[in-house]
Amino acid sequence: PGGYGPGQQGPGGYGPGQQGPSGPGSAAAAAAAAAAGPGGYGPGQQGPGGYGPGQQGPGRYGPGQQGPSGPGSAAAAAAGSGQQGPGGYGPRQQGPGGYGQGQQGPSGPGSAAAASAAASAESGQQGPGGYGPGQQGPGGYGPGQQGPGGYGPGQQGPSGPGSAAAAAAAASGPGQQGPGGYGPGQQGPGGYGPGQQGPSGPGSAAAAAAAASGPGQQGPGGYGPGQQGPGGYGPGQQGLSGPGSAAAAAAAGPGQQGPGGYGPGQQGPSGPGSAAAAAAAAAGPGGYGPGQQGPGGYGPGQQGPSGAGSAAAAAAAGPGQQGLGGYGPGQQGPGGYGPGQQGPGGYGPGSASAAAAAAGPGQQGPGGYGPGQQGPSGPGSASAAAAAAAAGPGGYGPGQQGPGGYAPGQQGPSGPGSASAAAAAAAAGPGGYGPGQQGPGGYAPGQQGPSGPGSAAAAAAAAAGPGGYGPAQQGPSGPGIAASAASAGPGGYGPAQQGPAGYGPGSAVAASAGAGSAGYGPGSQASAAASRLASPDSGARVASAVSNLVSSGPTSSAALSSVISNAVSQIGASNPGLSGCDVLIQALLEIVSACVTILSSSSIGQVNYGAASQFAQVVGQSVLSAF
């Protein structure tokens, strides 16, 4: 063994042009055979097993195929142009498991050292295993023969340990692949189709960085362009990357796919740390490039949720991309949303500020919302809304929608903190609702639902009434509506709006704001008081007030206080069913009537308009004294 020349036969009845197994020391013989690969096999010769040229070893391997390589084959990959790094697989070669034409299996033990001996062989030879052109490794496979496993053409098997270091060595070869040691058009484990590739082994992240110099190579996971990850993915797709893939993501091109059978131009979720990579790759956060897709079978141009840290990456995203959640324009989140929609995901703390940088309207939230709609915002969205001038508070843009299947142009409830955002969004009502938008409960267009906590402060900054209600709208009032009562009707309702039973602090003072229906609001109280002025009792009280005011002088606070007190006591006694507010309104109307009577009979000289505020204080003091 070990001394068989070309065309010679070893023990075991080998045919012409074949060779038997080599014994110890055959490595030195291989070095002497300059044109032959390591293992002492000459061109067109065969190893153990008695297989002749064009013959096949165990497993029904086809022509042009090769057996598996053992550990250590990684270092051998550095030899020969057009060869593959890790696993010692050359271009269009195959790993273990029934490989097809032009494929090659893994090399045997010690093949790394043999590869260095094969460096002088002509290009197109294989590194690991020391096999010359068209030669075969262990198992006695002749030229054009294949290793175990039955893989299809242009495919390749998995690489052994240490393939990461080999990938770095193979970086100088054009068309080679970094991590996993897979060359272009090669395949990993699992029966992948042509132009696809399997997952990379440990350490592939560092290899991907080394492979960056090769054109057409892929960063994370060691997948080249048009290659595929685990799970039977279609052409132009890619699997998910392992840990550390973030650094490699910078070299990744768009149009690749993740797990789950995604369509062309889509991409799966990234591993930890992908946020930093996304910023370098001009893609959205989560390491997704434009027009790529997340998990769940999303359509073209859609994208899934991003991982942690996507907010910071969004700030560096290219134009037209989405910050919040790493969604680009016209992209989609989980749940099969239609085009132009967007799902939840990555809305966590800090994502709001990123959303303000690149958030576009017309995106959608969870729950199957129609186009131009949007879901609820997460905590912190208030600050983002303030920065996004065109968007309403709560992170909702104009014409966007909240949860619950609302019609277009409507909007759902805002999250906590939306009040401060409403103050910044001049065109939007408090509670994070924009004009013509809708709250929960299936409200019609132009209506709005209840506001969240703190909406009162926002109401003061917006043109709408407190509680986030716009003009001609109505709903239940939230906490804090009293602060806005001065500019609204009772209960914190805006002008021409009506609350239940005239509730809300200061409703009596605001009774003169306008008339409502069904006996609610200031209109009904004023109407009843005006009717009572026509009664004989009211006329008698007005006459008495005129007499007292004329006799005491118009500037006497004590006289005015006495007139008010007498009127209130008499009205309450003659109308026991009236509330305190109704009695006060009636008394003030009668005193106004008395003043008009005095003016109508007086000769008015020069009026001191500057003293108006002074006499207003006199009246106020008189009212306080009366009660």
From Swiss-Prot:
Q: Which regions are flagged for Low complexity bias? A: 24-36, 71-81, 109-125, 161-174, 202-215, 243-254, 272-283, 308-319, 350-361, 379-391, 416-428, 453-464, 471-488, 495-508
Keyword Membrane in record:
no
The domain-related comment in the record is: Highly repetitive protein characterized by regions of polyalanine and glycine-rich repeating units.
Where is the segment annotated Disordered?
A: 1-508
Q: How does it assemble?
A: Major subunit, with spidroin 1, of the dragline silk.
Query: In which ranges do the sequence repeats occur?
Result: 1-36, 37-79, 80-121, 122-172, 173-213, 214-252, 253-283, 284-317, 318-359, 360-391, 392-428, 429-464, 465-488, 489-515, 516-530
Q: Give its localization.
A: Secreted, Extracellular space
- What top-level branch of life does the organism fall under? Eukaryota
Q: Does the keyword tRNA processing apply?
A: no
What is stated as this protein's family in its record? Belongs to the silk fibroin family.
Record-level GO cellular component terms: extracellular region
Q: What protein name is recorded for this chain?
A: Spidroin-2
Q: Report biased composition (Gly residues) as residue ranges.
A: 1-23, 37-70, 82-108, 126-160, 175-201, 216-242, 255-271, 284-307, 320-349, 362-378, 392-415, 429-452
Which coarse location class describes where this protein primarily resides?
A: secreted
Segment 15 X approximate tandem repeats: which positions? Answer: 1-530
**From what organism does this protein derive?**
Trichonephila clavipes (Golden silk orbweaver)
Q: Name one Pfam family in it.
A: Spidroin_MaSp
What this chain does, per the entry, is described as:
Spiders' major ampullate silk possesses unique characteristics of strength and elasticity. Fibroin consists of pseudocrystalline regions of antiparallel beta-sheet interspersed with elastic amorphous segments.
- Which UniProt keyword terms apply here? Repeat, Secreted, Silk protein
